[in-house]
């Protein structure tokens, strides 16, 4: 599991919050001071809470369940897509489509439609339709891919959400809370920490801050999955060894 160090967070600007006049009073326990009208986040608390969150994410990843990455703001979308893909997790980086969680079966129908268009391109169907129809299907597929591509392989609801900017992703937070799906999130000083289960007080606007946090989450998931595979291999080897011992005894 990755571990956050205060020095790394300082270099990434994780401690810079929003203007003090835009703060959410519920973030007071996580604020170190106000400087030049800007709130400074207490990185000791960030490190403690972030490491607690990573430990919980590690436990989820070891069960084989999926953790959905969510971040559609300009500074986060590329990072979210890259790190979620690297850790083989579903993600939403373009736009949260209402019902992505609460109306998941309907969303799955749209994904099946996208896959159907892909099959048309390879099974000869495209050769039997007009150029205009092919163009329309291509545009439909492109639109679906842009919005749903990150969850195209997700066959069931995720076990948890990891979110960058809970104010912007309020729809995702609301749907997760409705379904009882735990939410892990970077929470800036202008946001309500009570909306999420695992608060990581952090600058959710700076690219380096987002990169540091999202990469650590992805690293934790990857390491947890690798450990799970290693444990399964060792368990299989132990079983084979026991069976071999039984055969030796019977002989």
From Swiss-Prot:
The record ties this protein, via InterPro entries, to: Ribosomal_uS2, Ribosomal_uS2_bac/mit/plastid, Ribosomal_uS2_CS, Ribosomal_uS2_flav_dom_sf
Any one cellular component term from GO for this entry? cytosolic small ribosomal subunit
Pfam families reported for this sequence: Ribosomal_S2 (PF00318)
Q: Write out the similarity annotation.
A: Belongs to the universal ribosomal protein uS2 family.
One GO molecular function term? structural constituent of ribosome
Listed under GO biological process in this entry are: translation
Name of the encoding gene: rpsB
Q: Which organism is it from?
A: Chlorobium chlorochromatii (strain CaD3)
Return the protein name: Small ribosomal subunit protein uS2
Ranked from the top, the taxonomy reads: Bacteria, Pseudomonadati, Chlorobiota, Chlorobiia, Chlorobiales
Q: Mind listing the UniProt keywords for this protein, alphabetically? A: Ribonucleoprotein, Ribosomal protein
Q: Give the matching PROSITE patterns.
A: RIBOSOMAL_S2_1 (PS00962), RIBOSOMAL_S2_2 (PS00963)
